[in-house]
A protein has these predicted regions:
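N-terminal glycine/serine-rich phosphate-binding loop of ATP-dependent small-molecule kinases
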Residues: 1-98, 129, 157, 212-213, ...
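Gly/Ser/Thr-rich active-site cleft segment
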Residues: 9-11, 22, 102, 108, ...
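Short beta-strand scaffold segments in enzyme catalytic cores
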Residues: 14-18, 84-88, 187, 249-252, ...
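Acidic-glycine-rich active-site phosphate/pyrophosphate-binding loop
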Residues: 27-30, 34, 112, 217-231, ...
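Short acidic, glycine/serine/threonine-rich loops at helix termini
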Residues: 86-90, 172-176, 181, 224-227, ...
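A charged helix-plus-loop insertion that forms the helical arch/lid used to bind
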Residues: 93-109
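Catalytic phosphate/nucleotide-handling subdomain of diverse soluble enzymes
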Residues: 230, 234, 238-277
Length: 277
């Protein structure tokens, strides 16, 4: 029998789930992360390596609980905490140590950079028109601007920026990729065109090559490398789909896909989702 593996990179831990092709859940598992920390007021950071090690532990644990061999997993889907910033150089996926701790979704250091972002766009209204959102301190683009301004040595060495779950995707597949759900929370996506907003990226003076390829959530973004498969106890070349950020994925799972439906999620954060016609 074929099984599917879901991996969610949360704030407090990484959660895994195995289900069959009909969606029947066989088992779940969780591996905890160290609590977020930071050296400044309002800072919230984690070490991306901790996410990867938790992914390894939780994957082995869920296979054990489900009594499913890793070779029976036919596809992997990813979700995770949104908006975070992981800075990488060109080191390969087998190591892929981040250049600095990841700046998380609940980090509040970027008030000035949010102002810079709106100025670059032309106005708050224009930024909303371009990306679907105003500048928010938790979003990714202000974090990139903060690193450029305050840690120029790190920024100069940065060749790729990834969201948390997409760092795990890179460790699994060697592919720099994201998908439209998570990318919509970066302040850099043209949500109507479903691709990076090249105009805004240019106005910010950023190199578009920093950003990963953007897939749809259902598309295959890459396949497990031999190294990752060995670490995870899975089969090499297993496809990994785009997935989504944790909140959009949860909303779809709750059936918030038609007008008039609303969901509320209370976790490390509180989020209300409504379908917009």
């Amino acid at each position: 029998m074929a099984y599917l593996l879901g991996i969610d990179i949360g704030t407090s831990g990484t959660k895994t789930l195995i289900c069959d092709a009909q969606g029947l859940v066989k088992a779940t598992a969780t591996a905890a992360h160290p609590d977020p920390s930071g050296d400044g007021p309002g800072w919230s950071e984690q070490n991306p390596e901790d996410w990867w090690q938790a992914t390894i532990r939780a994957t082995h644990e869920v296979c054990k609980k489900a009594k499913v061999k890793g070779t029976a997993i036919t596809a992997v889907g990813l979700s995770g905490q949104m908006h975070g910033l992981v800075c990488l150089d060109d080191a390969g996926p087998d190591e892929a140590a981040a250049l600095r701790p990841a700046i998380l979704w609940n980090d509040q250091r970027t008030v000035a950079e949010c102002e810079d972002l709106e100025k670059a766009a032309g106005s708050r209204a224009r930024l909303i028109e371009m990306t679907g959102n105003p500048a928010l301190t938790g979003f990714t683009a202000p974090k990139i601007l903060w690193v450029r301004k305050n840690e120029p040595d790190v920024f100069e060495r940065t060749r790729h920026v990834l969201l948390p779950k997409d760092y795990i995707r890179y460790r699994m597949t060697g592919v720099y990729a994201t998908e439209v759900g998570d990318a919509s929370g970066t302040s850099l996506l043209d949500v109507k065109a479903r691709g990076w907003n090249r105009e805004l990226i240019g106005k910010l003076g950023l190199d578009a090559s920093l950003l990963p390829e953007c897939f749809e959530s259902h598309q295959v973004s890459g396949k497990l490398t031999d190294h990752a498969a060995t670490k995870l106890g899975l089969e090499a070349n297993t496809p990994v789909v785009g997935g989504s950020g944790d909140q959009p994925a949860g909303a779809v799972g709750n059936g918030i896909v038609t007008a008039g439906l609303v969901s509320a999620t209370m976790g490390t954060s509180g989020v209300v989702f409504a379908h917009a016609a």
